[in-house]
């Protein structure tokens, strides 16, 4: 299997309740000494208007949004097939939503009191 790369969108088996859906890889590739895990932001077509839903129109996905509140880490074995890749601007938009959800500083800023 191809190693998933940050910025790629894969069709993923997230289990019975979450079903098979597209998801964006946001973790770095696992090294030889690491567990074969990948962290993803699921894509949903059932949006709720949350500020943590990031709409990124791409031709290989139905209209919807990446749900930063739905972060999940799964084994590579749950990846079904690669659907495509976001460009750097699109990836940065989703990363911004993830940082907001996790309360992390914006890119280029440092946290602190």
Where do the protein language model's features map onto the residues?
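Conserved functional hotspots at enzyme active or ligand-binding sites that engage polyanionic ligands
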Residues: 1-113
């Amino acid at each position: 299997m191809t190693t998933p790369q940050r910025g790629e969108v894969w069709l993923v088996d997230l289990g019975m309740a979450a079903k098979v859906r597209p998801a964006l890889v946001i973790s770095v590739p696992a090294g030889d000494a690491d567990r074969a895990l990948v962290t993803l932001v699921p894509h949903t077509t059932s949006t709720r208007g949350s500020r943590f839903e990031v709409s990124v129109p791409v031709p290989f996905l139905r209209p919807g949004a990446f749900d930063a509140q739905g972060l999940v880490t799964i084994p590579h074995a749950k990846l079904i097939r690669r659907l495509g890749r976001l460009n750097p601007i699109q990836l940065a938009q989703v990363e911004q939503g993830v940082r907001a959800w996790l309360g992390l500083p914006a890119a280029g800023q440092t946290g602190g009191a």
